[in-house]
Each structure stands twice: as structure tokens, then as C-alpha cells.
Amino acid sequence: MNYLNTNTPLLLFQKNLNSEIYVDKSLLIEKISKYINTGDCYICITRPRRFGKTINATMLGSYYTKGYESHKLFHNLSIAGTKMYEKHLNQHNVIYIDFSRMPDFCNSYCDYITNILSGLKEDLLEYYPHLKKKEYTSLSQMLKETTDTFIFILDEWDSIFYKKFVTIDDKTDYILLLKELLKDQPYVELAYMTGVLPIAKYSSGSELNMFHEYNFMNDCIYEEFFGFNEDEVKNLCLKHNSVNYEDLQKWYDGYYLSNGTHLFNPRSVHAALRDGVCLNYWTETGPMNEIADCIEHNVDEVRDDIVKMVAGIPVEVELNGYSAAELELNTRDEILSAMVVYGFLSYYDGYLRIPNHELMEKYQKVLSRDSFGEVKEIVDRSKEMLEATLAEDEHKVATILEAVHDREIPFLKYNDENALSCVITLCYLYARKDYVIEREEKSGKGYCDYIFIPKKKGQTAIILELKVGHSSEEALQQIKDKNYTQKVEHCNEILLVGINYDKKKHHECKIERITNRE
């Protein structure tokens, strides 16, 4: 069998169960099952790649299929403890299609879709021999003729849209094919579909409007089943002590459930625990490049928003999702919305943020692109800025800051503390290679503006305090009075950096080195 009651989802789900790092999401089955054979049987869940869509799709396919006995896969999972566990276990015909799978030597949409349709027709003819007595003009006719009902598990339904050989007409044909196959068909018990971007990205009207769609911005029903929450990650850390929770949180946290609970990137957490080290496991570069191209045009100040978020400043915005029209990356809201859907930004309580250190590294590369003009030029001098700071060259640090100010880039004008923070972030961007830079972190008796925590033992830590209209000496004194050095007192050397901006004197800098004797 190719798609009908195939053992493919069972084999794939078994592999995940065999993994030492597995989080039980089986209660999703209970949520989905109540919509079988109802008017609400069309469910589409869109999430960024790496957020567990395929694992859950294989789990559902394994549970529902009547092609194989799968109790052994589920008897130790949470779903086995529910009252409905046996009601749908191995009771349904399941058509499981992973649309990201391509046939060999596939060079056109025709090759792609013919392979899927031929495989499914082959399955139906084998499973229902009486269908061989008649010719059919469509797959839906064959399915009706079986007089059976089916659960459709359609994983990565939108993957074909990323292929270069697909034309606009091909996309239209594909949407109409899905409509004919699924919409208002008596043989559909359940249609569970997953993808990356919302249906509205591809469908201009009512073709697939039977689906109830749940994405990163509007899902308060299934959100707990995609990604790892705080408790799940803490439990994984107890079982696998290769990486501590705090490091995982810094690298891969930063998304939110509707109730404010934190959500982690599951694939990256898995990889870090498996390898015993936190690294950048984000591999999805295509959409990031597409969005970076849009940012470069500075559409409605999107580029300015990105610089602010790199500086750790949340950006206030109203995002309404994609329920109305096809997504075009032309406006600020459209670009920022797409970045949330792709997982490049997190959105909660009206504010956008760069979720974590893993993605921060990606944005730093975006800011270094040639087309960012003056922003790139500032970033290019950030190595020089770090070297001047470590060399205690107060004059050079002040001179570099003065040069940035003299450029008169609109969103870097010193009309508030956030603008000054953006300048500092850009000027010290290179330092992120060697330091974890924390902004407004609790240390000692208060909150300091910036702490540069060395990634390697033996490096010099940096405490940076900003002042506007005061003096750099006052900034240094505040670091001492508030004991901001407490968080990095384990370091042998600490640089205290006080920076002041005054409309008359402009920039001044004072640097003092503290050596901790062991």
C-alpha cells in the first residue's frame, strides 16, 4: 500500500518512541477524535518547521488505521488512560499522505501529482477489487464507490508551493484538486492537514474554507501539542543531564502559549540534549532570506523594528492573522505577521520579540548584509568598538559612538533611552561572538544596562552603564554602588564602562578595570 492503511506512519512513530528524548503528546488524539464524522471534521494546523507537525501526524495515522494493530505503541502513553482510548483505536480507514515526498526525477507539477493520484488509485483498486469493473474520471468518484469512510492525514500539504517548477496555474489546479477530493464529500470522516503557511496564502476564495485553521497567532486549542513547554523541558533535563535547563531556555525558549506559558523549539531542544551542547540547530534558511529581502526595503519601518528587537526592545504591533486575503509581503503588518508564522518572531500580549539566542544569531547576519547600508557600516565597526573597549581606549569608544550619532539615521536619534540602546547594540554586535550580552539584567542591588558575560573562561567581563545628560563618572559610580559586578564576579577581570551623552558635550566614556585576586 502507498497511502491507504499503510504502515508508514506506524514505522515513523515507532522510531520517535524509540528515541531517548521523547515527549508524550498523545492527548492530541482525544482532542481530534471528538470531531470525527461531524460538521467540524476539517482541521488545518500550521506551524513553523521543526515544531512537531509530522510526529503528531504519524501518531494520529498510527492510532486510527485499521490496517495494523497498534495498541503496543500507545499502551504506555497518556491517551491509554482516557475513557475514549479504545473507541477509535484501529477502527478507521486512514489515507496518510506526506506531500513533501517527491518521486524520483520529478521535474514538474504533473509528475508530482500524477505520482500521488496513481498511488492512491492503485491502493483503492487493491483494497476494493470491485472498483476494477468500472472506469472512473476522478479519485472522488472512486472513493464514493467504495461506500466506506476515510480519515485523511495530509502532512505538509503546502510543500509543493516551495518547488521552483510549480507555476501559478499549477497552484490553482492543486487547490481545486484538494477541494474536489475533500469538500462536502460523504466519505470524509476527518481531514487533518498540516502545513507551514496559512491556507489564505494560497487560496484566494472559498475553495478550502471548510477547514478550521489554527496557527501560531490564533491557536488556543491545540497549542500545547506543538513545541515543548517549560515543565516538559525541565523533565527532559532531569532525565538527560547533558545540558542544563538555563542554557536550553536561553537558546531555544521565547515562544508563548495563549496563557503566557513559555514554549521551546522542540527540535533544537532535542538536538541539544542529544549532542550535549547548545548550538544553532536552525536550518530553515529560505524563508529567512525572503523576509530579509523585504526588511531591506525598510517597508513601513520594518527594518527599524528589527534593530530595536535585536537591542532587546519589544515592538508593539497589532497582528490580525490571515483570515481575509492572500498574503503579500508589502506592508509592515504583513511582513511581521509572516515572521511570526515562520517562527522567526514570537508574539504575545501585543508585542513582538526575537525569541531566543538561536534566532538572534540569524538576525545578526541579516544586519550584516550589504544592502543594509549605514546599518551595516555601523555593524562593520563593531569589532573595532570591542577592541577599543578591551584596550580601555576611552577616546576611541566615544569617537565611534559620535560617528554613529552624526549619521543622523532617523530611528537612531537620541529622543529616548531605547534609541541609545539600539546604537549600543549595533556598535557592539561583534561582541556577541564571544559574549552573552544581557540587557537590563538584575545584578547586585539593581538593574544594569548591559552585562557582557564571557562565553569562555579567562575572558574579560564587561559591565556597561548608560547615562543621558549626566556624566560617565556617575555611570561608573552607579555600577559600583549597585554592585552590578556580582553576576560576573567569577571572572578574573571586569571592565566597568560608563557612557554619557550630553547635547553640549556629546559622547564621553570612562573605563575602569577590576582584577579579582584568587
Locate each region found by the language model.
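Mg2+/Mn2+-dependent nuclease catalytic core
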Residues: 171-176, 468-486
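Conserved catalytic cores of phosphodiester-cleaving nucleases, focusing on short active-site segments
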Residues: 424, 448-452, 460-468, 482
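Active-site metal-binding core of divalent-cation-utilizing nuclease and nuclease-like domains
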Residues: 142-147, 432-457
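A short, contiguous, amphipathic alpha-helix enriched in charged residues
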Residues: 121-122, 421-431, 483
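Phosphate-binding site recognition
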Residues: 1-416, 431-434
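Structural motif
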Residues: 151, 460-462, 495
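Short secondary-structure junctions
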Residues: 428-436, 489-491
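Domain-level recognition of nuclease-like catalytic cores that cleave nucleotide substrates
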Residues: 487, 492-518
